[in-house]
Swiss-Prot record:
Encoding gene (name): fadA
Catalytic reaction annotation: an acyl-CoA + acetyl-CoA = a 3-oxoacyl-CoA + CoA
Name of the molecule in the record: 3-ketoacyl-CoA thiolase
Entry-linked SUPFAM superfamilies: Thiolase-like
GO molecular function, one term: acetyl-CoA C-acyltransferase activity
GO CC annotations on file: cytoplasm
InterPro entries assigned to the protein according to its UniProt record, in alphabetical order: FadA, Thiolase, Thiolase-like, Thiolase-like_sf_Thiolase, Thiolase_acyl_enz_int_AS, Thiolase_AS, Thiolase_C, Thiolase_CS
Active site: C91 (acyl-thioester intermediate), H343 (proton acceptor), C373 (proton acceptor)
Domain of life (superkingdom): Bacteria
Principal cellular location given in the protein's record: cytoplasm
Entry EC no(s): 2.3.1.16
GO biological process: fatty acid beta-oxidation; phenylacetate catabolic process
Length: 387
C-alpha cells in the first residue's frame, strides 16, 4: 500500500463574513487562487499530472453550486483533463476531501491530488435553503439541528461553566493574535486580494476576524445566544462567521520523491464516526480514539492537537474526555482556533490540518492530530506523522 504524504498546505486569510475583506470576492475565486498558488509553489509537479481535485463545500448552491471544485479548477486554468469533485460532510468536508484523496493514493488509483475546501458564509449563509424533513423529529430531537442548543446540552452534561467558556474564548483570540504578530501564520497564509473598509482593492495577508482586544471581562457581559433563559453559550464563545479557503497538495511518497518534492508529513491514520445528533459536538472524542487506535498510538504520543473550536462549550468536553485538560496550553490549538479565526464550514478541515503541520514543524514533534465535530452528529479525525 502506498504511503500518503502532504507536500504543501496553504490557506487564504480568514475574512469577516459581514462586510469583510472578501465581500466582493466569490468562493470560486478564493478556491482558484489557492489552486494556482499551490501549483506555482511546487513547479516540479505539472498541473496535467494531477489525478483529481477533491474540494470541500457545505452550501453547494448559488456561487458554490454546480460542483464548485470543477468551476474553480477551470478558473485556475488547470488542464481540462484533470477531474474535480466537490465533497460534503458538513463541517468535516475538506478533511473528508483529504481522506478521499488519501484512499485513492493508498490503493494506487492516484499519485497526486489537490485537496481543500471553501465556504463564503457572507455570500451563502449557513442556513440558506435548509429544509429539514419534518419526520426527523420521530428519530432525533428537533433541537438536534440547532448547533447552539446541542452545545448547551454538552455544557450541562459535562459541567462546563460560563466562566470556563469565556476563558477559553479569550485564549483563542489571544493566541491567534500572538501567532499573527510573531509571523507564525506566514508560511500558511497566501496573500489574497480583497477590499478594505473604504472599498480599496488590496492584498490581505492576515486574518481580519481576530479580535485582539477580547477579554474575559468583556465576554462576561454578553447575553446567551441560543437559550436566553438558562443558557451559557454566547456569540463570543462561538466560532466566528468568516469566509475563506484552504488547500493541500497530497501525493504518494514515491511520486513526491521521484519529483524531488520534500514531503512534510505522512497521513498515519484516518477516522470518521457517528454520534448522537443531540450532542453533535462530542464527535471528536470517538473519532480521535478510533484514529489513534488505527495508528497504534495513544493521546500521550501526540505532540500537538488541532481541534476545531465550533464552540468553547463543545471543545472543552472533548478535551476533558480525551484526558487533555491538564495539557491545553502545551498541546491544544496553540495558535488559537475557530472562535478567533472563524469556521468557514467547507474550509475548516484543511485549515486546521494546515495549521497543525506548521505547528508540528515549529515544535519539532513527530505526531499531530486534527479533529472536528460535524453537524447532525459525526466526528472526523486525522493523525499526521512528520517525515
Amino acid at each position: 500500500m502506498e504511503q500518503v504524504v502532504i507536500v504543501d498546505a496553504i490557506r487564504t486569510p480568514m475574512g469577516r463574513s459581514k462586510g469583510g475583506a472578501f465581500r466582493n470576492v466569490r468562493a470560486e475565486d478564493l478556491s482558484a487562487h489557492l489552486m494556482r498558488s499551490l501549483l506555482a509553489r511546487n513547479p516540479a509537479l505539472e498541473a496535467a499530472a494531477l489525478d483529481d481535485i477533491y474540494w470541500g463545500c457545505v452550501q453547494q448552491t448559488l456561487e458554490q453550486g454546480f460542483n464548485i471544485a470543477r468551476n474553480a479548477a477551470l478558473l485556475a486554468e488547470v488542464p481540462h483533463s484533470v477531474p474535480a469533485v466537490t465533497v460534503n460532510r458538513l463541517c468535516g468536508s475538506s478533511m473528508q476531501a483529504l481522506h478521499d484523496a488519501a484512499r485513492m493514493i493508498m490503493t494506487g488509483d492516484a499519485q497526486a491530488c489537490l485537496v481543500g475546501g471553501v465556504e463564503h458564509m457572507g455570500h451563502v449563509p449557513m442556513s440558506h435553503g435548509v429544509d429539514f424533513h419534518p419526520g426527523l423529529s420521530r428519530n432525533v430531537a428537533k433541537a438536534a439541528g440547532m448547533m447552539g442548543l446541542t452545545t448547551e446540552m454538552l455544557a450541562r452534561m459535562h459541567g462546563i461553566s460560563r466562566e470556563m467558556q469565556d476563558a477559553f474564548a479569550a485564549r483563542s483570540h489571544a493566541r491567534a493574535w500572538a501567532a499573527t504578530q510573531s509571523g507564525a501564520f506566514k508560511n500558511e497564509i497566501i496573500p489574497t486580494g480583497g477590499h478594505d473598509a473604504d472599498g480599496v482593492l488590496k492584498q490581505f495577508n492576515y486574518d481580519e476576524v481576530i479580535r485582539p482586544e477580547t477579554t474575559v471581562e468583556a465576554l462576561a457581559t454578553l447575553r446567551p445566544a441560543f437559550d436566553p433563559v438558562s443558557g451559557t453559550v454566547t456569540a463570543g464563545t462561538s466560532s466566528a462567521l468568516s469566509d475563506g479557503a484552504a488547500a493541500m497538495l497530497v501525493m504518494s511518497e514515491s511520486r513526491a520523491r521521484e519529483l524531488g518534492l520534500k514531503p512534510r508529513a505522512r497521513v498515519r491514520s484516518m477516522a470518521v464516526v457517528g454520534c448522537d445528533p443531540s450532542i453533535m459536538g462530542y464527535g471528536p472524542v470517538p473519532a480521535s480514539k478510533l484514529a489513534l487506535k488505527k495508528a497504534g498510538l495513544s493521546a500521550s504520543d501526540i505532540g500537538v492537537f488541532e481541534m476545531n473550536e465550533a464552540f468553547a462549550a463543545q471543545i472543552l468536553p472533548c478535551i476533558k474526555d480525551l484526558g487533555l485538560m491538564e495539557q491545553i496550553d502545551e498541546k491544544i490549538n496553540l495558535n488559537g482556533g475557530a472562535i478567533a479565526l472563524g469556521h468557514p464550514l467547507g474550509c475548516s478541515g484543511a485549515r486546521i490540518s494546515t495549521t497543525l503541520l506548521n505547528l508540528m514543524e515549529h515544535k519539532d514533534v513527530q505526531f499531530g492530530l486534527a479533529t472536528m465535530c460535524i453537524g447532525l452528529g459525526q466526528g472526523i479525525a486525522t493523525v499526521f506523522e512528520r517525515v
